[in-house]
Amino acid sequence: MQYLVDTNIISEIMKKEPDEHVWKWFSGLEVVYFSAVTVEEIYFGLSRRNLVRKLSWFQQFSEDKAVILEVNERISRWSGEKRGALSAAGKSVTMADSLIAATAHEHGLILATRNTKDFENFGIALQNPFLK
């Protein structure tokens, strides 16, 4: 199985003492896929707190070990359609989460996230590495 790793999983891995279940799961991945949206979210979070070492680690990790999936027209279209339908049904979803869900859908990946509730209405496969 292949996974699109959500921002909160990358954030957990960068902690001094990450959750043991997440670490074990993450260490077993042959390929680490994440969305370009995750890159933006990580850079934003680390830059805002001026965490230079973690930013350097993430940059190196991204270049050496990860496959970053770009947002293209198909992903944008699917995201907009799903987010629009969810909004019309009274369900609020962020653009970032919608684009991440669309990226998982487009590439046929399971979305690994702690926040499964945020993605449950997209009809994509989900896994929470924080659970056993």
Regions found by a protein language model. Name each.
Residues R114:
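Conserved acidic donor-binding loop of glycosyltransferase catalytic domains
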Residues Q2-Y3, E20-E106, I110, E120-I124, ...:
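PIN-domain endoribonuclease scaffold, especially VapC-family toxins
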